Amino acid sequence: MAVEKSNTTVGGVEILKPRTDNREYRMIVLKNLLQVLLISDPDTDKCAASMSVSVGSFSDPQGLEGLAHFLEHMLFYASEKYPEEDSYSKYITEHGGSTNAYTASEETNYHFDVNADCFDEALDRFAQFFIKPLMSADATMREIKAVDSENQKNLLSDGWRIRQLQKHLSKEDHPYHKFSTGNMDTLHVRPQAKGVDTRSELIKFYEEHYSANIMHLVVYGKESLDKIQDLVERMFQEIQNTNKVVPRFPGQPCTADHLQILVKAIPIKQGHKLGVSWPVTPSIHHYDEAPSQYLGHLIGHEGEGSLFHALKTLGWATGLSAGEGEWTLDYSFFKVSIDLTDAGHEHMQEILGLLFNYIQLLQQTGVCQWIFDELSAICETKFHYQDKIPPMSYIVDIASNMQIYPTKDWLVGSSLPTKFNPAIVQKVVDELSPSNFRIFWESQKFEGQTDKAEPWYNTAYSLEKITSSTIQEWVQSAPDVHLHLPAPNVFIPTDLSLKDADDKETVPVLLRKTPFSRLWYKPDTMFSKPKAYVKMDFNCPLAVSSPDAAVLTDIFTRLLMDYLNEYAYYAQVAGLYYGVSLSDNGFELTLLGYNHKLRILLETVVGKIANFEVKPDRFAVIKETVTKEYQNYKFRQPYHQAMYYCSLILQDQTWPWTEELDVLSHLEAEDVAKFVPMLLSRTFIECYIAGNVENNEAESMVKHIEDVLFNDPKPICRPLFPSQHLTNRVVKLGEGMKYFYHQDGSNPSDENSALVHYIQVHRDDFSMNIKLQLFGLVAKQATFHQLRTVEQLGYITALAQRNDSGIYGVQFIIQSSVKGPGHIDSRVESLLKNFESKLYEMSNEDFKSNVTALIDMKLEKHKNLKEESRFYWREIQSGTLKFNRKEAEVSALKQLQKQELIDFFDEYIKVGAARKKSLSIRVYGSQHLKEMASDKDEVPSPSVEIEDIVGFRKSQPLHGSFRGCGQPKL
């Protein structure tokens, strides 16, 4: 349906903003020609800023690949006004905020958010990046190592590898061809060999390119626009303006030599992918007409008659996406990516024939006004009823948009097609021709068939030319399937009215309970959007009873999603999302989006559960997909492996992936057919319904589900016995004990090692929670600074809190290519020893400042229904049911004394603490494997070496579960 537009005037120019947006906007231009968009939001708890600089990796000097990205790293270090190293990040982190940046081809974007009461100083520190940064020689060398570590992390990532291969196969004199991340070789070894000083080049690059007139700033504050403007004018007007012209890189990256090519590449992971791309007219020049969005909508559609539906029916594909890929003002690629099955890999030519058949269909049918109008209506509703998101996420895109779009479209960008122009769309359709395509085909089956290697990632590949006539042969060989345009979308909402809910509950209430289910209900009292959130957790004791059951339950949920895909895809396009996935004790159904037609989708999904049957052809495809996923576990980043082992050690009723992979090899369709009725035979459904839904509607939804599943003359489900209600249990580590688990990295080609150093502390308790959280806040930046910035152990360095079903702890996570896990573990202990004095000597003022920052973080309001619902659902699912958690913990924080934090640290965290319980997971990459034996010999006493994870877990006491503890009786 058409939605009333809402405009606001910005610097004398009208800007399109969402109808539901009550923020105020103002555009100003400083005397140095810096363009700034000010946003005032009195309701915000966090303030944020984003600076977009119109220079990126395309401007890297020859022989200094990655310099723009390296500069992005360096600006975080220090400035003349704030010379203490890393003080910017420290200040932001200690005041509840976060910092980040990215380098793109023609843009570098810096951004942060922080608690509102600390915004002034944070913004001033940020401004100094662009006024007088310090780039010391010592810091320069250390940060080159950080960039190198970041690159090491990417070397075995298929996404990074294929992207660089696509760039490699382009014109060498076009910047698209470049390697943009940088590494030790490009930023130190090669320049040094040529007598080039990287630091001098870094400063030169900064001075040449960082000019106020090609920067765009967005500042999001709580104060009035006038006050924010005053801040910005004081802080940012000293940025130098050297009147630079935004760099442009005309010309196409691909010549005839790089088109009509078939590239076969060998990926790291199992699976086959087919990517086809065409150089096309950049949509940015016609964003109101949205040619690539229109074509992506149709070629990427998954409903009946679509290309994907045909490929899925043939058993050849498991996924397909289409749309505009990399683009600038001068070039663009339209890309189609297809995930192939093993059978699909053997029918690549027919698949490409079907793709070109579908493109021919689009050429023959012409551009349809009703499809464009439908797409426009969906986009318009999405824009005007968009959820509020965290300020930093919101403004990053706006800052980038300011470079490209006229002022009126800064907020909307190209997300709102409004002008139907068949000629412009037809032009791009015609560009998707057999004469200018590029095919990238990835499979491990090409092992031994390649003769080339991409230089930066060493990806093995081969290349051959494919003529238009060959494509025509493939088109003729394609199977005869009925491809057609999608049907009109029945899920587009037409009722966007808000319910006048009688209940004004501020927390979920238990609305209904029966032997079959329990319904928690929370009406929308905050967001005023026509949306709802539904969560239904099917607790099935059989689901987690063995590795076999876990795999069978997984296959069941995937088959459900598979069967519903062509129907539910329309709902997804219209802004109504659903998913069926594994949960701790069974499987869960999630629905989120416009409430108008949500119940139709919910009842369809439940009907499919009730009438579930196994289709052998779809089972075979799903089994193949899941098998490859398990086989690819061994290619995960080492720190992900370490976190997995930590969970496997701690969480009861979890099974090793190797055992689940073994189950898959023997699984047949009839096993699933026999299992699902048994899985569902004993079930309890925990329900949460929130948003623009009245309480009687919520009750009616759940009653309908009970009628379908439990109250049939031959019910599919029966209620659980009281003894069957499942609980999540977590291993209780021994006080004063250290536990160690040493393991080879599962990918022999990966040089990176990883450590997770976990300290288990307590069972959910408000007063203990706040002490652990305060320790985490105070120690987080110190950890990052010491282990990453100073010691350069690795790009991935983090201190994070951990919550396993209400059992709280803290974990240090480090991945490194330069040091082994034993050494890293010793550095974590050293860090904790050094932290003692910092904590003991902390001034009362600093203590109060940290407490205030944590209080502000806790009082931060939920931005949208999804965020709020996830918070409450965690309480329901874990059984803690502390819906007042934030307020209670704030109350406890206000009473907290500094000595209590010190006592907590001394008792549970510090090295040698009497009640400390630590678990070190050490994963050894290929270059540190030889250190494992000596590391094992050197573990201190008293300690436990875990050899058999499941054997260890079964022999340990478990923490009590919150589920069933203090909950309302059924």
UniProtKB/Swiss-Prot annotation:
Kindly list the places in or outside the cell where this protein is found, as annotated in its UniProt entry: Peroxisome
Give the InterPro entries listed for this entry: Metalloenz_LuxS/M16 (IPR011249), Pept_M16_N (IPR011765), Pept_M16_Zn_BS (IPR001431), Peptidase_M16 (IPR050626), Peptidase_M16_C (IPR007863), Peptidase_M16_M (IPR032632), PqqF-like_C_4 (IPR054734)
Q: Which keywords does this Swiss-Prot/TrEMBL entry list?
A: Hydrolase, Metal-binding, Metalloprotease, Peroxisome, Protease, Zinc
Cofactor(s) in the UniProt record: Zn(2+)
Which terms does the UniProt entry file under GO BP?
A: proteolysis
May I have one GO cellular component term?
peroxisome
Could you tell me the EC number(s) of this protein? 3.4.24.-
| Domain of life, source organism | Eukaryota
Cofactor binding summary note: Binds 1 zinc ion per subunit.
PROSITE patterns for the chain:
INSULINASE
Function description: Peptidase that might be involved in pathogen or wound response. Not required for peroxisome biogenesis, indole-3-butyric acid (IBA) metabolism, fatty acid beta-oxidation or degradation of glyoxylate cycle enzymes during seedling development.
UniProt name for this protein: Insulin-degrading enzyme-like 1, peroxisomal
Upper taxonomic classification of the species?
Eukaryota, Viridiplantae, Streptophyta, Embryophyta, Tracheophyta
